A protein has these predicted regions:
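Eukaryotic acidic, Ser/Thr-rich intrinsically disordered low-complexity regions
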Residues: 457-474
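Alpha-solenoid helical repeat scaffolds
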Residues: 2-8, 12-443, 469-474
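C-terminal interaction modules of eukaryotic adaptor/scaffold proteins
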Residues: 448-454, 458
Length: 474
């Protein structure tokens, strides 16, 4: 009797195994056929359905295979088959995830996709995918609501890093500040390559260079040849004034990274690193590379690079090149302002201080630049005249020639009757009066006029000693 019992059980088990094997074989055939776009893929899927109509998991696999091939009709069909096969019926969370993915990827109704994901959450609140997918869909409507949904996930999915998930939502929404703040709270050791990529970028572009470097170094442990991690490790080290460390990444970035497309910004930053290290040859070479690559769509503009090159030559007292690149800068900057015009005057002034033989010529060019500033930008007319006078003083330090007199007189004419003078205007007026007072007393031999200017100075600054001395003269 026992022998018969065992024979019956063995037969049942063999039958079950054979059925299971057949189901799996039909499923695999369908999956392979869909993936390879076989002509009979639909027929293979139909056969697999007949063999697996009670296997919800298998039916979702077929639906996902169709979704990967952008066959949304069959993806939806098999999602519904899976939902019917689920226990309880129509409460199978993976089926709703699939329906949501179809709508989110190829549909036009984000609300409908979010509805499917909500049903997935309701039927399996311990599966983090529903929360994450709902948040990804809803981020376009309200990133803060999407973040709140992920907070709901925390209670039911304690193993999930919600800080990283929330940060990802904000990054996709273009809110780098919120992305950074949430990544900064996440456990960096649990972040994958994609999260670290977002962490390093959100940190760098919000000015948190310590965290940018930390994220880049963590990413390089996972993928040493990653271009983004090497690039931003180089940039972050520069911003942290770790110039030798920044230099160590120059070779790595340009020679030991995969899929790196080098830009004008890369070469510009590299030039700044070499500049900080006083490596002038490499600095100028990198500036040249940056200028050869820059175009209208570049992150950094041509005029900004030209200005940096000019500043570098000025620092090196290479005045010819400083002027050349500064004039190129002025020629290509779209909207010039008075500071740009004054920059030209300042280069000529510094050059004059370092070239006695050409001093008169160069001061003349500085004065000309200031006069142009006053003409182009009338709001700077007073300041322009004052600076022209200051330049003239470099050629007439005692004031005997009176070179600065016309410009100081212009300052006085523009300011002395101005009712609402600010502190800087009072300062310019006071020193203009001082020059005219000294000129009248020392070279004009006109004590009365000198005293007149002295009284005007004391009305501005009662404690100004030189004016007090002139006033007290008998």
């Amino acid at each position: 009797m026992k022998a018969i019992k065992y024979l019956v059980m063995a037969a049942l088990m063999l039958g079950f195994s054979a059925t299971a094997f057949a189901q799996e074989a039909e499923l695999n055939a369908a999956l392979e056929g869909i993936k390879s776009k076989a002509p009979n893929a639909a027929e293979l899927a139909k056969t697999a359905y007949k063999k697996n109509k009670k296997n919800a998991e298998a039916l979702v696999k077929i639906g996902r295979a169709f979704l990967e091939q952008k066959d949304t009709a069959n993806a939806n069909l098999f999602a519904n088959y899976a939902n019917e096969a689920g226990k309880p019926k129509y409460q199978y969370a993976p089926a709703y995830l699939l329906l949501g993915d179809v709508e989110a990827s190829y549909g036009t109704d984000g609300g409908k996709a979010a509805g499917y994901y909500n049903q997935a959450i309701a039927f399996d609140p311990t599966n983090p995918e529903g929360y994450k997918k709902w948040a990804l869909v809803y981020r376009k409507i309200s990133p803060s609501q999407a973040a709140k949904k992920l907070q709901d996930m925390k209670a039911n999915c304690p193993g999930e890093d919600i800080d990283a998930a929330i940060a990802h939502i904000y990054m996709l929404a273009g809110d780098e500040k919120q992305a950074y703040e949430n990544y900064a709270k996440a456990d960096i050791n649990k972040l994958d390559k994609g999260n670290l990529n977002e962490f390093v970028r959100s940190s760098y572009f919000t000015g948190h260079f310590d965290d940018a470097l930390r994220a880049a170094e963590a990413g390089l442990k996972i993928e040493p040849r990653n271009a983004v991690f090497n690039r931003l490790a180089m940039f972050a080290n520069y911003e942290l004034k770790k110039y030798d460390a920044a230099k160590s990444y120059i070779h790595k970035y340009f020679n030991e990274t995969d899929s790196a497309k080098f830009s004008e910004y890369d070469h510009f930053y590299t030039a700044l690193i070499y500049q900080a290290l006083e490596d002038k040859a490499n600095m100028y070479a990198e500036y040249d590379k940056a200028l050869s690559l820059v175009n209208d769509s570049s992150m950094i503009k041509r005029h900004a690079i030209l200005k940096s090159v000019s500043d570098s030559y000025l620092k090196d007292l290479a005045f010819d090149n400083a002027i050349k690149y500064y004039q190129d800068y002025l020629a290509c900057k779209p909207e010039l302002n008075s500071d740009d015009q004054e920059g030209l005057a300042k280069i000529y002034s510094k050059w004059a201080d370092n070239d006695e033989a050409r001093k008169s010529e160069l001061i003349g060019k500085a004065i000309e630049a200031y006069r142009v500033m006053g003409e182009k930008y009338p709001i700077q007319a007073i300041y322009s005249a004052y600076q022209c006078a200051t330049m003239s003083n470099k050629l007439d330090k005692t004031g005997e020639k009176g070179l600065a007199k016309p410009d100081y007189q212009k300052v006085v004419s523009l300011l002395e009757n101005k009712a609402d003078r600010d502190n800087s205007e009072n300062t310019m007026l006071k020193y203009s009066y001082h020059y005219l007072m000294s000129n009248a007393f020392l070279y004009g031999k006109n004590k009365a006029l000198a005293k007149e200017y002295a009284n005007k100075i004391l009305a501005i600054d009662p404690d100004y000693a030189p004016a007090q001395q002139i006033k007290d003269l008998k």
